[in-house]
């Protein structure tokens, strides 16, 4: 599987936020010195919030570029499935085959190492892989330091590469959180961060129909759809099938991006090349 260069968003300046952090703290010090704590303290809180809030915004590009929507070639969406491989993976693959759909599976390194045959099944059925961290530390991913973050991304990348034979080129943050130390690791491994534009919150305990309704409301050509497998609530297979049915009912198809020929617009797997279109939204 190759990656279209027009979609590849490797961070070029992973520390670009640092000068702004230093300037903001200098402004806080000067304000505190000039006007006292009544001005300095609120300014300090605001300056810290400015750098903390983007960590929790899945499609924020404050710390790293993000691909949140594809160019809109007629009739296609990008289906992405997180948190595998799991015991449900074969059933997910059967559903995708039934609806003639392709997906990118964002896999957790530890789980891939425990079920390498599932990873190979995904590839053998014509789907793609993405890096979704090695241990999926969802409660503390947002506060991992540089060494721990680098290790999470590196170990997953090495594990998936060892099983698949080729390195993944896509990355998705755990719960979409991206702190200042994600971008350096992405640059190191040549990874593009992928967000989403259609999400139903199926990774946690949920009402399946409510999840499907939320996703369907956001379905449009070029959408990046976020789904999960193997969640404890046991509804993922039903949700995936309902979303696949909705995609077909809307006259859409789930397909993977391919590398275009030189100077050509990136086609879609199973589709044909089309005229040049604007670059993807990266927000």
Cite the ranges covered by each PLM segment.
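His/Asp/Glu-enriched short active-site or ligand-binding loop at hydrolase and phosphoryl-transfer sites
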Residues: 177-179, 183-218, 251-263
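N-terminal pre-catalytic segment of deacetylase/amide-hydrolase enzymes
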Residues: 2-78, 86-94, 98, 243-244, ...
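Acidic-and-aromatic substrate-binding clefts and catalytic sites of carbohydrate-active enzymes
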Residues: 83-87, 106-116, 139-145, 172-180, ...
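Catalytic grooves of carbohydrate-active enzymes
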Residues: 216-261
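Aromatic/hydrophobic pocket-lining residues that form the small-molecule binding cavity
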Residues: 89, 115, 149, 153, ...
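Active-site beta->alpha N-cap acidic-glycine motif
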Residues: 53-141, 152-155, 159
């Amino acid at each position: 599987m190759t990656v279209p260069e027009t979609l590849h968003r490797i961070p070029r300046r992973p520390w670009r936020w640092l000068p702004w952090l230093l300037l903001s703290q200098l402004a806080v010090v000067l304000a505190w010195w000039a006007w006292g704590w009544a001005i300095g303290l609120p300014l300090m809180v605001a300056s810290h919030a400015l750098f903390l809030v983007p960590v929790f915004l899945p499609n924020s590009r404050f710390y790293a570029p993000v691909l949140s929507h594809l160019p809109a070639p007629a009739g296609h969406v990008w289906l992405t499935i997180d948190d595998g491989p799991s015991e449900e993976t074969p059933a997910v693959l059967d559903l995708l085959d039934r609806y003639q759909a392709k997906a990118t599976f964002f896999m957790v390194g530890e789980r891939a190492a425990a079920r390498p045959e599932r990873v190979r099944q995904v590839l053998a059925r014509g789907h793609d892989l993405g890096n979704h961290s090695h241990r999926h530390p969802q409660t503390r991913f947002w506060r991992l330091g540089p060494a721990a973050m680098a290790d999470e991304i590196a170990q997953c990348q090495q594990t998936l590469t060892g099983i698949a034979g080729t390195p993944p080129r896509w990355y998705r943050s755990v719960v979409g959180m991206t702190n200042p130390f994600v971008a350096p690791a992405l640059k190191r491994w040549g990874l593009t961060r992928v967000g989403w534009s259609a999400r139903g919150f199926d990774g946690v305990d949920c009402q399946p129909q409510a999840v499907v309704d939320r996703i369907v409301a956001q379905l449009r050509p070029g959408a990046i759809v976020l789904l999960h497998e193997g969640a404890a609530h046991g509804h993922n297979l039903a949700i995936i099938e309902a979303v696949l049915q909705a995609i077909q009912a809307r006259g859409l198809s789930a397909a993977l991006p391919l590398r275009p020929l030189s100077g050509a617009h990136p086609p879609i797997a199973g589709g044909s090349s089309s005229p040049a279109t604007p670059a993807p939204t990266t927000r």
